[in-house]
Amino acid sequence: MQGERKWHMLLTIFFLLITSGQCMDSKEVTQKERRTLLDLILQVIRDSQQREKNTSRRCIAGLLTSAQDMKLSSPEKPFYIPRLDNSRLIEIFPRDLNMKGKFIQHFTAGPVKFSSECRIQFHRLYHNTRDCSRPAYYKRCARLLTRLAMSPLCMQS
């Protein structure tokens, strides 16, 4: 299904690029007005990259205090998207890093304890499954962790 969507999108973009170039072939159009869709797209990309370099430095220095800057490491800094109309920047902040732990502690009614024999299974379940890596499945993750804690392997010691 996704492959079909990509194919349709590529085909649509291809036809748009071809037709935009052919519409400009009339003799009444001056050279200044003769710009293809591809030229416009490339210009917008170049402008946004230049604007991003200039504005992101200014905004990061102005919006974050030194405590917030120290708290956020480099991959967690907000991502700024420049707007075409130069009104305001859109800020995208990352999710709370401890949110998964908070959710699971809430759903299991307290911290879940694991013995040393269960540590490997807990680590695999907590860090490598879809249930524990996506916020929509945290409730399912809490149920799986509770079942693991009650399993005979983990109850031995």
Swiss-Prot record:
List keywords of the entry alphabetically. Answer: Secreted, Signal
Alphabetized InterPro entries for the sequence = ALKL1/2
**Pfam families with a match to the protein in the record:** ALKL1_2 (PF15129)
Q: Where in the cell is it found?
A: Secreted
Q: Which GO terms describe its molecular function?
A: cytokine activity; receptor signaling protein tyrosine kinase activator activity; receptor tyrosine kinase binding
Signal sequence residues:
1-23
Q: Name one GO cellular component term.
A: extracellular region
A Gene Ontology BP annotation from the UniProt entry: positive regulation of ERK1 and ERK2 cascade
Family, per entry = Belongs to the ALKAL family.
Task: Give the matching PANTHER family.
Answer: ALK AND LTK LIGAND 1, ALK AND LTK LIGAND 2-RELATED
Q: This chain belongs to which protein, by name?
A: Protein ALKAL-like
